[in-house]
Amino acid sequence: MSNVVRSKFAIPFVLASLAMSSQLALASECAAPQREQGEHLFARDCAACHTAQKDGPTLMGPNLHGVIGRTPGTLQGVTYSQAMKSQKAAWTAQGVAAFIEQPQAAVPGTYMPYAGMADAGERQAVTCFLAGIK
C-alpha cells in the first residue's frame, strides 16, 4: 500500500482514536457529584432545546446523547447551519466545553441562540454529564 493511501486512512483513524481517548479520559476524571451537577445544569440551561436520552426525540436542537465522538452536523432529522455542517472533526469534551462557553464564537454562524455558559466549572460539569450518559 502506498504512503499516500495509508495516510488517507491514518488521519481519520487517529482523529477517531483521539476523540475516543478524550471521552474515556474525561469519564474517568469526572466524579459522580460533578456528573450530577452537570445533569442539573443541563436541565436548567439546555433541556428546553435538547434531549440527552438514548433514542430521545429531537427538539429545537439535536439530541446530545452520544455527542462526544460524533461529527457535528450529522444527526438525522436536525436542521443544521452550514457553519455547523462544515465542521469535520468529531466533538471532543474540550470542543463541547468551548462551544457551550460561547457558541457563536466557537462556530460562527451556528443556529444555536444560547449566549453561553461563563463558568468553567459548570461547563466541565455539563461535559462530564454528556460524556457519562449511557
Give, region by region, the residue ranges found by the protein language model.
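The N-terminal extracellular segments of secreted preproproteins, especially immediately downstream
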Residues: M1, E29, D45-A48, T127
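Bacterial N-terminal signal peptides that target proteins for export
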Residues: S2-F13
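C-terminal segment of classical bacterial N-terminal signal peptides
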Residues: A10, L18-A27
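Electrostatic cytochrome c docking/interface patches
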Residues: A25-A43, A52, P57
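Sec-exported extracytoplasmic/periplasmic mature domains
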Residues: A43, A47-K54, G69, E101-A105, ...
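Short cysteine/histidine-rich zinc-coordinating motifs and their immediately flanking basic loops
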Residues: T58-N63
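Short Fe-S-cluster ligation motifs
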Residues: T74-A97
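C-terminal capping alpha-helices of c-type cytochrome domains
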Residues: A90-K134
